[in-house]
Amino acid sequence: MPKMKSHRGACKRFKATASGKIKHERMNGSHNLEKKNRKRSRRLHQATILDSAKEKQIRRMILA
């Protein structure tokens, strides 16, 4: 059986932290920012930790 390949698109979007959590950038923060208020656009530029519901699935994609 061949080795499992990691999902290249997921590897570009998600990173594993030193403690093992999965970090990712938020969506909707790159364009059409004039429609969004300052508080929202500021928060969209901060990275966040992935919630536990999707963590197992993403971990298999990036660490395979």
Swiss-Prot record:
Matches recorded under InterPro entries: Ribosomal_bL35, Ribosomal_bL35-like, Ribosomal_bL35_CS, Ribosomal_bL35_sf
Range of residues in the leader sequence: none
Bias (Basic residues) ranges: 36-45
Annotated GO MF terms: structural constituent of ribosome
Family: Belongs to the bacterial ribosomal protein bL35 family.
Spans annotated as Disordered: 27-47
UniProt keywords, alphabetically: Ribonucleoprotein, Ribosomal protein
Gene: rpmI
Organism annotation: Chlorobium phaeobacteroides (strain DSM 266 / SMG 266 / 2430)
Protein name according to UniProt: Large ribosomal subunit protein bL35
Record GO biological process: translation
GO cellular component: cytosolic large ribosomal subunit
Source organism, top-level taxon: Bacteria
